[in-house]
Design a protein with these regions (language model features):
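Hydrophobic packing residues within well-ordered alpha-helices of enzyme cores
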Residues: 29, 54-58, 167, 171, ...
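Active-site phosphate-binding/coordination module
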Residues: 24-126
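Mg2+-dependent phosphoryl-transfer enzymes with acidic/Ser/Thr/Gly-rich catalytic loops
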Residues: 2-9, 25-26, 190-274
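Conserved acidic, metal-coordinating active-site core of Asp-based
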Residues: 104-219, 223-228, 240
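Alpha-helical scaffold elements within enzyme catalytic domains, especially in hydrolases
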Residues: 35, 99-100, 170-173, 244, ...
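N-terminal glycine-/serine-/threonine-rich phosphate-binding loop
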Residues: 2-4, 8-13, 17-39
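Active-site metal-binding loops of divalent metal-dependent hydrolases
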Residues: 14, 49, 221-222
Length: 274
Protein backbone atom coordinates (compact mmCIF):
# COMPACT_ATOMS: atom_id res chain seq x y z
CA UNK A 1 0.00 0.00 0.00
CA UNK A 2 3.02 2.28 0.40
CA UNK A 3 3.33 5.37 -1.83
CA UNK A 4 -0.06 4.81 -3.43
CA UNK A 5 -2.37 7.63 -2.41
CA UNK A 6 -4.95 6.55 -5.00
CA UNK A 7 -5.94 3.58 -2.85
CA UNK A 8 -7.04 5.84 0.03
CA UNK A 9 -10.33 7.51 0.94
CA UNK A 10 -10.23 10.18 3.65
CA UNK A 11 -13.49 11.70 4.89
CA UNK A 12 -13.81 14.71 7.18
CA UNK A 13 -16.57 16.31 9.18
CA UNK A 14 -16.80 20.09 8.71
CA UNK A 15 -17.73 21.95 11.89
CA UNK A 16 -15.15 21.60 14.62
CA UNK A 17 -13.03 19.36 12.42
CA UNK A 18 -12.18 20.74 8.97
CA UNK A 19 -12.96 24.24 10.21
CA UNK A 20 -11.85 25.81 13.46
CA UNK A 21 -14.23 26.96 16.17
CA UNK A 22 -14.73 30.30 14.41
CA UNK A 23 -15.93 28.35 11.33
CA UNK A 24 -12.84 29.24 9.30
CA UNK A 25 -10.63 26.85 7.33
CA UNK A 26 -7.09 26.75 8.78
CA UNK A 27 -4.54 27.30 6.01
CA UNK A 28 -2.58 24.27 7.17
CA UNK A 29 -5.63 22.07 6.49
CA UNK A 30 -6.10 23.47 3.01
CA UNK A 31 -2.43 22.94 2.13
CA UNK A 32 -2.39 19.37 3.44
CA UNK A 33 -5.58 18.46 1.58
CA UNK A 34 -4.19 19.92 -1.65
CA UNK A 35 -0.99 17.90 -1.25
CA UNK A 36 -2.89 14.70 -0.46
CA UNK A 37 -5.22 15.12 -3.47
CA UNK A 38 -2.44 16.16 -5.87
CA UNK A 39 -0.67 12.92 -4.98
CA UNK A 40 -3.76 10.94 -5.94
CA UNK A 41 -5.62 10.62 -2.63
CA UNK A 42 -9.41 10.79 -2.47
CA UNK A 43 -10.75 13.36 0.00
CA UNK A 44 -14.30 14.45 0.71
CA UNK A 45 -16.64 15.85 3.34
CA UNK A 46 -19.39 14.25 5.40
CA UNK A 47 -21.61 16.68 7.26
CA UNK A 48 -24.98 17.25 8.83
CA UNK A 49 -25.27 20.38 6.70
CA UNK A 50 -27.63 20.47 3.74
CA UNK A 51 -26.26 20.58 0.22
CA UNK A 52 -26.27 24.36 -0.14
CA UNK A 53 -24.46 24.81 3.16
CA UNK A 54 -21.95 22.02 2.53
CA UNK A 55 -21.12 23.47 -0.90
CA UNK A 56 -19.77 26.65 0.67
CA UNK A 57 -17.01 24.67 2.36
CA UNK A 58 -16.57 21.99 -0.31
CA UNK A 59 -15.84 24.58 -3.00
CA UNK A 60 -12.87 25.96 -1.04
CA UNK A 61 -10.98 22.69 -1.32
CA UNK A 62 -10.60 22.11 -5.06
CA UNK A 63 -11.87 18.52 -4.86
CA UNK A 64 -14.28 16.57 -7.08
CA UNK A 65 -15.21 13.54 -4.99
CA UNK A 66 -18.95 13.15 -4.22
CA UNK A 67 -19.79 14.49 -0.76
CA UNK A 68 -22.13 13.21 1.94
CA UNK A 69 -24.73 15.63 3.31
CA UNK A 70 -27.47 15.66 5.95
CA UNK A 71 -25.64 13.13 8.13
CA UNK A 72 -25.64 10.46 5.43
CA UNK A 73 -29.14 10.98 4.05
CA UNK A 74 -27.72 12.08 0.71
CA UNK A 75 -24.66 11.89 -1.53
CA UNK A 76 -24.06 14.57 -4.16
CA UNK A 77 -21.75 14.28 -7.17
CA UNK A 78 -20.40 17.79 -7.73
CA UNK A 79 -18.64 16.76 -10.93
CA UNK A 80 -21.94 15.68 -12.51
CA UNK A 81 -24.12 18.18 -10.59
CA UNK A 82 -26.53 15.51 -9.41
CA UNK A 83 -27.73 13.79 -6.27
CA UNK A 84 -26.75 10.14 -6.58
CA UNK A 85 -28.37 8.98 -3.35
CA UNK A 86 -31.14 10.34 -1.10
CA UNK A 87 -32.93 8.54 1.73
CA UNK A 88 -35.44 10.89 3.42
CA UNK A 89 -37.70 10.31 6.41
CA UNK A 90 -40.80 8.31 5.41
CA UNK A 91 -44.32 9.76 5.30
CA UNK A 92 -45.23 7.82 8.44
CA UNK A 93 -42.10 9.15 10.09
CA UNK A 94 -43.12 12.70 9.20
CA UNK A 95 -46.43 12.20 11.02
CA UNK A 96 -44.63 10.96 14.14
CA UNK A 97 -42.26 13.93 14.12
CA UNK A 98 -45.14 16.38 13.87
CA UNK A 99 -47.01 14.60 16.65
CA UNK A 100 -43.99 14.92 18.95
CA UNK A 101 -43.57 18.57 17.99
CA UNK A 102 -47.21 19.35 18.79
CA UNK A 103 -46.92 18.01 22.34
CA UNK A 104 -44.06 20.21 23.56
CA UNK A 105 -44.71 23.93 23.30
CA UNK A 106 -41.10 25.04 23.84
CA UNK A 107 -39.69 22.57 21.33
CA UNK A 108 -38.39 24.01 18.06
CA UNK A 109 -38.43 22.09 14.78
CA UNK A 110 -36.31 22.64 11.69
CA UNK A 111 -36.74 20.49 8.57
CA UNK A 112 -33.80 20.13 6.19
CA UNK A 113 -34.40 19.44 2.52
CA UNK A 114 -31.50 19.10 0.10
CA UNK A 115 -31.35 22.83 -0.66
CA UNK A 116 -33.95 24.54 1.54
CA UNK A 117 -34.34 24.75 5.31
CA UNK A 118 -37.93 24.86 6.52
CA UNK A 119 -38.66 26.62 9.81
CA UNK A 120 -41.74 25.34 11.63
CA UNK A 121 -43.62 28.34 13.12
CA UNK A 122 -42.26 31.74 14.15
CA UNK A 123 -40.57 30.39 17.27
CA UNK A 124 -37.90 28.54 15.29
CA UNK A 125 -34.98 30.68 16.43
CA UNK A 126 -32.41 27.90 15.97
CA UNK A 127 -33.29 27.29 12.33
CA UNK A 128 -33.41 31.01 11.61
CA UNK A 129 -29.95 31.61 13.09
CA UNK A 130 -28.23 28.78 11.20
CA UNK A 131 -29.93 29.91 7.99
CA UNK A 132 -28.72 33.48 8.42
CA UNK A 133 -25.15 32.54 9.35
CA UNK A 134 -24.42 31.05 5.93
CA UNK A 135 -27.13 32.98 4.06
CA UNK A 136 -28.98 29.76 3.27
CA UNK A 137 -32.29 29.41 1.47
CA UNK A 138 -35.02 29.03 4.07
CA UNK A 139 -38.78 29.21 4.32
CA UNK A 140 -40.94 30.06 7.30
CA UNK A 141 -43.89 27.70 7.66
CA UNK A 142 -46.43 29.24 10.02
CA UNK A 143 -48.43 26.02 10.08
CA UNK A 144 -47.08 22.49 10.03
CA UNK A 145 -49.40 21.82 7.09
CA UNK A 146 -47.21 24.21 5.11
CA UNK A 147 -44.17 21.97 5.49
CA UNK A 148 -43.46 20.08 2.24
CA UNK A 149 -43.59 16.30 2.33
CA UNK A 150 -41.17 13.71 1.00
CA UNK A 151 -38.02 15.86 1.24
CA UNK A 152 -37.13 15.57 4.92
CA UNK A 153 -33.48 14.54 4.74
CA UNK A 154 -33.23 15.25 8.44
CA UNK A 155 -35.03 17.22 11.13
CA UNK A 156 -33.55 19.02 14.09
CA UNK A 157 -35.23 19.49 17.46
CA UNK A 158 -33.97 22.38 19.59
CA UNK A 159 -34.79 22.95 23.25
CA UNK A 160 -33.46 22.78 26.78
CA UNK A 161 -30.99 19.99 27.44
CA UNK A 162 -33.52 18.29 29.70
CA UNK A 163 -36.25 18.38 27.04
CA UNK A 164 -33.89 17.23 24.30
CA UNK A 165 -32.81 14.22 26.36
CA UNK A 166 -36.47 13.41 26.93
CA UNK A 167 -37.21 13.55 23.19
CA UNK A 168 -34.15 11.43 22.45
CA UNK A 169 -35.29 8.77 24.92
CA UNK A 170 -38.83 8.86 23.50
CA UNK A 171 -37.61 8.28 19.95
CA UNK A 172 -35.20 5.52 20.94
CA UNK A 173 -37.74 3.62 23.04
CA UNK A 174 -40.99 4.09 21.10
CA UNK A 175 -39.99 4.93 17.53
CA UNK A 176 -36.70 3.12 17.05
CA UNK A 177 -38.02 1.30 13.97
CA UNK A 178 -38.60 4.60 12.19
CA UNK A 179 -35.60 6.76 13.04
CA UNK A 180 -32.00 7.08 14.03
CA UNK A 181 -31.15 10.10 16.15
CA UNK A 182 -28.10 11.70 17.71
CA UNK A 183 -27.15 14.76 19.71
CA UNK A 184 -25.18 17.46 17.91
CA UNK A 185 -25.10 19.63 21.04
CA UNK A 186 -26.72 19.43 24.49
CA UNK A 187 -29.61 21.45 23.01
CA UNK A 188 -30.05 19.90 19.56
CA UNK A 189 -31.23 16.45 18.52
CA UNK A 190 -31.04 15.47 14.87
CA UNK A 191 -33.37 12.81 13.50
CA UNK A 192 -33.01 10.90 10.23
CA UNK A 193 -34.63 7.92 8.55
CA UNK A 194 -33.84 4.52 10.06
CA UNK A 195 -30.47 3.27 8.87
CA UNK A 196 -29.23 6.72 7.88
CA UNK A 197 -26.01 7.88 9.50
CA UNK A 198 -22.61 9.18 8.49
CA UNK A 199 -21.13 5.70 8.63
CA UNK A 200 -23.68 4.24 6.23
CA UNK A 201 -23.08 7.21 3.93
CA UNK A 202 -19.33 6.67 3.95
CA UNK A 203 -19.74 2.95 3.28
CA UNK A 204 -22.07 3.64 0.35
CA UNK A 205 -19.61 6.14 -1.09
CA UNK A 206 -16.71 3.71 -0.59
CA UNK A 207 -18.57 1.11 -2.64
CA UNK A 208 -19.36 3.64 -5.37
CA UNK A 209 -15.68 4.62 -5.57
CA UNK A 210 -14.55 0.97 -5.30
CA UNK A 211 -12.00 1.64 -2.57
CA UNK A 212 -10.89 -1.14 -0.23
CA UNK A 213 -12.30 -0.81 3.28
CA UNK A 214 -8.82 -1.26 4.77
CA UNK A 215 -7.78 2.03 3.18
CA UNK A 216 -10.60 4.17 4.55
CA UNK A 217 -10.03 6.91 7.11
CA UNK A 218 -12.22 9.54 8.72
CA UNK A 219 -11.94 12.34 11.24
CA UNK A 220 -14.67 13.94 13.35
CA UNK A 221 -15.25 15.58 16.69
CA UNK A 222 -18.66 14.74 18.16
CA UNK A 223 -21.30 12.08 18.76
CA UNK A 224 -22.91 12.36 15.34
CA UNK A 225 -19.55 11.21 13.94
CA UNK A 226 -19.48 7.93 15.89
CA UNK A 227 -20.98 5.74 13.14
CA UNK A 228 -18.54 7.18 10.61
CA UNK A 229 -15.59 6.58 12.91
CA UNK A 230 -16.69 3.00 13.60
CA UNK A 231 -17.15 2.29 9.88
CA UNK A 232 -13.68 3.20 8.62
CA UNK A 233 -10.48 1.27 9.29
CA UNK A 234 -8.56 4.32 10.48
CA UNK A 235 -10.68 6.63 12.67
CA UNK A 236 -9.40 9.86 14.18
CA UNK A 237 -10.86 12.70 16.19
CA UNK A 238 -9.89 16.24 17.05
CA UNK A 239 -8.18 17.01 20.33
CA UNK A 240 -11.25 18.74 21.77
CA UNK A 241 -13.53 15.71 21.21
CA UNK A 242 -15.24 14.10 24.23
CA UNK A 243 -13.21 11.36 25.91
CA UNK A 244 -15.57 8.58 24.84
CA UNK A 245 -15.08 9.63 21.21
CA UNK A 246 -11.32 9.50 21.68
CA UNK A 247 -11.60 5.95 23.01
CA UNK A 248 -12.86 4.58 19.69
CA UNK A 249 -10.22 6.32 17.59
CA UNK A 250 -6.89 5.09 16.33
CA UNK A 251 -5.49 8.61 16.41
CA UNK A 252 -6.28 11.75 18.39
CA UNK A 253 -5.24 14.77 16.38
CA UNK A 254 -4.65 18.28 17.65
CA UNK A 255 -7.45 20.76 18.43
CA UNK A 256 -9.42 21.79 15.34
CA UNK A 257 -8.15 25.36 15.76
CA UNK A 258 -4.63 24.12 15.05
CA UNK A 259 -5.35 22.09 11.91
CA UNK A 260 -6.58 18.66 12.95
CA UNK A 261 -7.17 17.44 9.39
CA UNK A 262 -3.61 18.32 8.40
CA UNK A 263 -2.36 16.56 11.52
CA UNK A 264 -4.27 13.41 10.57
CA UNK A 265 -3.08 13.49 6.96
CA UNK A 266 0.50 13.71 8.23
CA UNK A 267 -0.18 10.71 10.48
CA UNK A 268 -1.61 8.63 7.63
CA UNK A 269 1.28 9.49 5.35
CA UNK A 270 3.91 8.67 7.96
CA UNK A 271 2.36 5.40 9.11
CA UNK A 272 0.63 3.97 6.03
CA UNK A 273 1.12 5.80 2.75
CA UNK A 274 4.73 6.97 2.48
Amino acid sequence: MKNDYSKWLLVSDIDGTLNDKSMKLPSVNKSAIERYVENGGTFTLCSGRNLQSLSIHYNKLGIKTPAIFLNGAGIYDFDKSETIYFNPITSEGEKIILDIFSKYKTLQLTVFGTDIIYLATRTCIYGYVISKLDKLNHKLCKKTDDLPRGVWGKVSFFGTSRLIRKIQNLIKTQYNNYFDCFLTSPFTLEVVNKGVNKGAGVEKLRCILDISSENTAAIGDYYNDIDMLKTVSHPACCGQAPDDIKEICEYVACHCNNGAVADFINYLEKNYIL
